[in-house]
Amino acid sequence: RDYYASRGLGDVYKRQDDQGQELGRAGSLWVLLNLSTRHMAPPDSILSLMPDNSDLVAPLGLPGPVTEVSGAVTTERKVPVYTDLDVNHHVNNTKYMDWCCNALGIDCMKEHALRRFCLNYDVEVLPGQEIRTELRTLGDHFSYCGFHESQRSFDIGGELMARK
């Protein structure tokens, strides 16, 4: 059984088995991008097109800040490739998780699954930009962030669990 709710500029998904046991949940918040200015646009112009879900109780709270793990840091330099980009010609937010899982490495991901993660997007990553990434791990916890020059573009924090 699935649950889905759209609350303005965000979505919530929950998946349950036939006995009602929760298998997983996910939430997202998003913004409108003015493609001419490459800045966030106020949502007022489309709010009238969105369903009124003000009576729904949010099944997930708002995401908090990502906690940077205090473990040893591993850095890499990345330049986005074509398949990292979406229709808006910037790196798609799902690609940041790909980058993170790749940085954690094949051996780690063969032995572990994501128990939870939070991804915060600060500013878009564009083609040609060199991104410095930092991976920190401490036990089953990790943090991964990307910077263009001195500007943080995104950060991810999470916890791994052993695969069964």
Language model features with spans:
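Single conserved hydrophobic/aromatic residue that forms the stacking wall/gate
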Residues: D2-Y13
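Residue-level detector of beta-strand face positions
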Residues: K14, V31, S143-C145
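Acidic, low-complexity central loop/insert segments
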Residues: R15-S28
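Solvent-exposed strand-loop boundary residues in beta-sheet-rich modules
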Residues: D18-Q19, S36, S150-R152
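A structural microfeature
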Residues: G24-A26, P42, R152-I156, A162
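Hot-dog-fold acyl-thioester-processing enzymes
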Residues: R25-G27, N34-R115
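Short beta-strand edge segments in extracellular beta-sheet folds
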Residues: L29-L33, M161-R163
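Acidic/His-leaning functional-site neighborhoods
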Residues: E76-L160
